[in-house]
Amino acid sequence: LFAEGAEMAHTVLDSVALGYQPVWSRARQLSAVRLAVHVLHPESVDAEHLWRAIGSDWPAAAPTLILAPDTPELIDQALREPPLRNTWLEVPHAWFEAPEGLAQLVEASSKGHQLLRAADLSAVRSEVITPLDVRSLLQLNPNDAWLALRQRNSVELTLSRALLSGQIYAGVASHQLACVCLDEAGAWGLLGWPDEDVLHSHRDRQPQCSNAVIDQIRVGMVAECSIEQLERLVRQDPVLVYRLLALVNSSAYGLQHEIQSLRHALMMLGFTSLARWLREQQAASRVTTSATGAASERGTEDDLHPVRYAMVMRSRLAQHLLESGAEDNLRAEVYLTALFAQLDRLLHEPLGGLIQKLPLSERACDAVLRASGPYHRLLDVARAQGDPPKLSALPAVCDRHEIGLEHANRSLLRMLATSRDYAPTTIAPA
């Protein structure tokens, strides 16, 4: 059921290691994805064939793809190629400072390339005019972070001197700094999200189902969507998926047979019972909100969304790593396995206790609790592709699990091309 590595001469997609990192907007939605390209075999890699493998017509509805090659040779070739739709090309700051490099960037920009300058904030903070008026991906160091947080409440200094508006920031390690960048300094987005600090700041609050996802589900139900569409909506929220499966398998529900799949659970519930249960989840959320203050609801909901959706992206990648001919029920099981493997982070409970409440298959339990079995290798490769700083280790991870590097790279591209973050919808309470 799993793709084998190709035993042939190197092709462009088994000569690079691709990794991804989401960019989150001020609304805490997925606005772009940085695709790191780590070149393994330079003699087999050129921009023309790599661009062709990525696809000349990157979907407009997909998140903007930030192409980030890690060698000067590949960047040089990429600048000479026609631009790909809905993509940006990341170029190191040094290219903008050298006359020859700047001339090449001017020409590439005139041909339609959207350039993203990668620089340290400390190196460009004092510049008056940005070369070519490009957006920048700015790396924060600890001193930058300290300065931004210090100036936030200073009457003598302004925040604009610490951070530049309209840019993408990387290296944001705290929840407070993320809020400063997005809400006060006017950042375009954040590369990555301070998951652990955000989760730590919400550790004393009872985790709730996402109201935004519930609203989307209710819209779909009003429109009489198919069971397949309903399943896609529900599985956007790991907490909602877990609680729904726990509900239908509880003694209170009284079913004689265990329900392992989300689709089966939705069919057993039916629209009427599901709608009633969703109203109960939102009511519980409102009770929690009234106890903590209305102002905290939006912050909790929005700031947790990047954590939840990153889990969804990794689960979808694990699913795509299956062979194209795999059955739907197998794909669904792999998705749930990957989703539940990270559930303890959201629910602040030991993973073993959470999983015991669900009738998961032995393969799923092996992957989640023991890091073993056939599903574990899918989860492990998906994890490695979501860790760009360690992309050099991806070939070894793929070899260990007998998954071809080319297949892993294609799976990642398919996952990203079909990623759609939901737009929050407001519905009058039922």
What are the residue ranges of the model-derived segments?
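Generic structural signal for short, solvent-exposed loop/turn connectors between secondary structure elements
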Residues: 41-50, 119-125, 140, 222-224, ...
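Conserved alpha-helical "signature site"
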Residues: 62, 146-430
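Short, low-complexity N-terminal regulatory "tails/caps" that precede and couple sensory modules
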Residues: 1-8, 430
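Short, solvent-exposed coil/turn linker segments
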Residues: 22, 68-70, 83, 92-94, ...
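Bacterial c-di-GMP phosphodiesterase EAL domain
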Residues: 5-88, 95-99, 104, 306, ...
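Generic preference for hydrophobic/aromatic residues in regular secondary structure cores
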Residues: 15-20, 33-37, 64-65, 85-87, ...
